[in-house]
């Protein structure tokens, strides 16, 4: 199957998912420098919020260096061509957060739920459509639901008014075959005018391969991050994805050299540690654990003397999902007690 001439919208995650490894402490200068670089490189859509979305500032998820309003207010006025998006998780973000984002100039809102809980998104998706925003339903941890199950959840979000549905590999656990199975089923079930997106993580080094697999079965929005900056081993590395798309004739509108420069000159120097597939990030992908659990598990490991890898495997065995960050320490305490540490 040739993908030459296929047009894809690349959606940058550096300034939202990338907040996880930065412990949500990016400065306004870092945000604006990277955002303007992405804009100049031709990236059409850039996500800006706390790593856990609008309203994420909390004891549970971490306190950011600045408020969502401050980050959005700094970035949006500097954009020449790119539009800015925001993530919202019902139960963390509220309708008031949604209205605030719209008033600041946010173009796209992505309403995210666990892949079996789309029904909690109705209020937020409905309001976003009333506000005439580009409205995305974002189904997280997609490996934990079957293709048939994802179809039901996607159709719920579509019925609430979402004009794009994302299948999200939050754990970086899926392989290309699993991506194709899920996205092809969702694509066939949605209205032709409803867009389809894919969000990948690189914990098994499958980010680019899975993104191409998604494009093959009809996805036209693809998430990626410069230098892969994101939870776990990072998101699909954008500069690599753009280069591969260029070689395949997939049209992204993003300049290969410019996005590579953003990654190398702006993002890599900002990293607090290398974003790579270490033993713990690999365990996230292998065990199917939510990507942002990584730093929480490492902190619990240092505190209780249980290897982070063992904590992550146990979290996977228990089926923990995004939003249960408080259970990581509880799990580590239980394991330490059982081991007599």
Curated annotation (Swiss-Prot):
Binding sites annotated in the UniProt record for Mn(2+): 17, 199, 201
CDD domains: DRE_TIM_HOA (cd07943)
Keyword Manganese: yes
Xref: InterPro entries: 2-IPM_HCS-like, 4OH_2_O-val_aldolase, Aldolase_TIM, DmpG_comm, DRE_TIM_HOA, PYR_CT
Record-annotated site: Transition state stabilizer: 16
EC number: 4.1.3.39
All residue ranges annotated as the Pyruvate carboxyltransferase domain in the record: 8-260
Binding site for substrate: 16-17, 170, 199, 290
Disulfide bonds: none
GO molecular function annotation: 2-isopropylmalate synthase activity; 4-hydroxy-2-oxovalerate aldolase activity; manganese ion binding
Name of the top EC class for this enzyme: lyase
Catalytic activity: (S)-4-hydroxy-2-oxopentanoate = acetaldehyde + pyruvate
BP GO terms, sorted: catabolic process; L-leucine biosynthetic process
Catalytic residues as annotated in Swiss-Prot or TrEMBL: 20 (proton acceptor)
PANTHER family documented for this protein: 2-ISOPROPYLMALATE SYNTHASE 1, CHLOROPLASTIC-RELATED, HOMOCITRATE SYNTHASE-RELATED
NCBIfam families: 4OH_2_O_val_ald (TIGR03217), PRK08195.1 (NF006049)
Name listed for the protein in its UniProt record: 4-hydroxy-2-oxovalerate aldolase 2
Native species: Dechloromonas aromatica (strain RCB)
UniProt lineage: Bacteria, Pseudomonadati, Pseudomonadota, Betaproteobacteria, Rhodocyclales
